[in-house]
């Protein structure tokens, strides 16, 4: 037999003297410190560069190569958070953050997350934590009623709702359910003939879900959209593509209209798309990840008209509903389709409650087994602010976006590239008048008359100009915006949605944009943007 060395004996014996990792008083002391730390962070968040200014690999150079052998104090750790971690953060909660889509937070959302994490239950089935399951079904019905969803999507009717991590998971789960429902009718050997449809503006989550679900990559359709339809998916074009696929021996399976696309917040017409899908027995999933939250406001509800004809509907409460990441709300008309596709029932999970068929086991509504108590934070948000205040928060963001849109329209150097629908404005800086095209077939610059540049060359020049312009603005650290390319046009996205953003911040962002427009146009040289 071997023998323990002295260091091992000392290490093992001293471990019995270590403070319990869940000591209540230490939890109280350190918890207060963390709350104070975060409160100070939000008080001062406006002072930080919105986008991190670090270079790739910065953190590995600053941190030790191995974990500490002995414990370190919370004070030391928080000091390192300040000096090492915060410089590497892009501050999504900054009032000057307008990039991507918002990840709006709130006190209620943060504290709900704290409660959820603090309880640390794993609610894979009803028995594992009844409150986690039952609260989820309650808040999903609450939220569904706020959206005026039909009873067919609610537990009070024949459907039901579940909290997923993200829209990617929601789309994958519904696509998997649609796949199995179809293959159970036609035979699993036909999986290679199934086709999934979206538009060229549909989120990439649909394509990834199709790959994971085993759909032939050649059978994924990203149908082209056009400016005259505000880049929405045309039901007529969808029908044409479906008919071509049927003629080729393929089988239409799934279509995903979007309410508020990522690039431009375009809205696909739900009802006409559902009419087409119904003819070919397709599953319709409505992805309202960004804009769905706004539909609790009566003036925006019409954007999801026709949802009663769809099979499933999802939105991200962690985007524009003041609930921390992650919290995707998914409603389905036929929960049994999800359960049949995703259910497993090993012996070690069997219990009387499940066998009674009187409870929901959410493990069968998702990909993973384990699941977080997400409903607690959504419940706290709904209760802490109420429907009236939540509507007013959303309206305030739309109002600020309208203000920004008005400022853009007042300056002839800019143009709105797509219509504003919600709280995001898409715009671009126009090339200077020194390259204006004249009717006589030539254009002028500072050096005199030069041959006419064709439309494509003008577009390339304008796109490069806006790319450089956006990079210059973001490099200041004062504001942060991102871009999209829609219809070949490079445009800047200004997405209002941070909980801390006020009108003064929007005015501040506009002044920065104006200042840098002055600079970049003042030294404009065609050669600078032609490469």
UniProtKB/Swiss-Prot annotation:
Gene Ontology CC terms: cytoplasm
Tissue distribution: Predominantly expressed in the roots and stems, while a lower level expression is seen in the sepals and carpels of fully expanded flowers.
Reaction(s) catalysed by this chain's protein: L-tyrosine + H(+) = tyramine + CO2; L-dopa + H(+) = dopamine + CO2; 5-hydroxy-L-tryptophan + H(+) = serotonin + CO2
Protein's UniProt keywords contain Lyase: yes
SS bonds (residue pairs): none
One BP annotation, GO: amino acid metabolic process
EC class name: lyase
CDD domains: DOPA_deC_like
Required cofactor names: pyridoxal 5'-phosphate
Enzyme Commission identifier(s): 4.1.1.28, 4.1.1.25
Family: Belongs to the group II decarboxylase family.
Subunit text: Homodimer.
Role description: Marginally higher substrate specificity for L-DOPA over L-tyrosine.
Protein name per the record: Tyrosine/DOPA decarboxylase 2
Gene: TYDC2
């Amino acid at each position: 037999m071997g023998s323990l060395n002295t260091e091992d004996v000392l290490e093992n014996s001293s471990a019995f003297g270590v403070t319990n990792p869940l000591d209540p008083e230490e939890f109280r002391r350190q918890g207060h410190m963390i709350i104070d730390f975060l409160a100070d962070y939000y008080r001062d968040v406006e002072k930080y560069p919105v986008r991190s200014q670090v270079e790739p690999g910065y953190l590995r150079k600053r941190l030790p190569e191995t974990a500490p052998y002995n414990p370190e104090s919370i004070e030391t750790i928080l000091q390192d958070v300040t000096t090492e971690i915060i410089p590497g953060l892009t501050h999504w909660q900054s009032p000057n953050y307008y990039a991507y889509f918002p990840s709006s937070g709130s006190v209620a959302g943060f504290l709900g997350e704290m409660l959820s994490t603090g309880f640390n239950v794993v609610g894979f089935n009803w028995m594992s934590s009844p409150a986690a399951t039952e609260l989820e079904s309650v808040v999903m019905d609450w939220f569904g009623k706020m959206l005026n969803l039909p009873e067919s999507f609610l537990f009070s009717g024949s459907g039901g709702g579940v909290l997923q991590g993200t829209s990617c998971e929601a789309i994958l789960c519904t696509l998997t359910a649609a796949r199995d429902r179809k293959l159970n009718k036609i035979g699993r050997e036909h999986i290679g003939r199934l086709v999934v449809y979206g538009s060229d503006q549909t989120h990439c989550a649909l394509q990834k879900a199709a790959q994971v679900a085993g759909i032939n990559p050649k059978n994924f359709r990203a149908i082209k959209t056009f400016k005259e339809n505000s880049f929405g998916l045309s039901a007529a074009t969808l029908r044409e593509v479906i008919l071509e696929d049927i003629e080729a021996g393929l089988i239409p399976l799934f279509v995903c209209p979007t309410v508020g696309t990522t690039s431009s917040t375009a809205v696909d017409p739900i009802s006409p798309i559902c009419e087409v899908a119904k003819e070919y027995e397709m599953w319709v999933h409505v992805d309202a990840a960004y804009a769905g939250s706004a539909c609790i406001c009566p003036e925006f509800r019409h954007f999801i008209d026709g949802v009663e004809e769809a099979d499933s509907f999802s939105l991200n409460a962690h985007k524009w509903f003041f609930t921390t990441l992650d919290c995707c709300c998914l409603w389905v008309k036929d929960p049994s389709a999800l359960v049949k596709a995703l259910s497993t029932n090993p012996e070690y999970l069997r219990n009387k409650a499940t066998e009674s068929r009187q409870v929901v086991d959410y493990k069968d509504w998702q990909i993973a087994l384990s699941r977080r108590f997400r409903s607690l934070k959504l419940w706290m948000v709904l209760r802490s602010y109420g429907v009236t205040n939540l509507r007013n928060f959303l309206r305030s963001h739309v109002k600020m976006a309208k203000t920004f849109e008005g400022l853009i329209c007042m300056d002839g150097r800019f143009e709105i590239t797509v219509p504003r629908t919600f709280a995001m404005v898409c715009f671009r800086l126009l090339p200077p008048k020194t390259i204006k095209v004249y009717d006589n077939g030539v254009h002028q610059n500072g050096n005199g008359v030069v041959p006419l540049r064709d439309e494509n060359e003008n577009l390339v020049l304008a796109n490069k100009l806006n790319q450089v312009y956006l990079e210059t603005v973001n490099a200041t650290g004062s504001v942060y915006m991102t871009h999209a390319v829609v219809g070949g046009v490079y445009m800047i996205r200004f997405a209002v949605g941070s909980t801390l953003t006020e009108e003064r911040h929007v005015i501040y962002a506009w002044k920065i944009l104006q200042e840098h427009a002055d600079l970049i146009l003042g030294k404009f040289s065609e050669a600078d943007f032609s490469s």
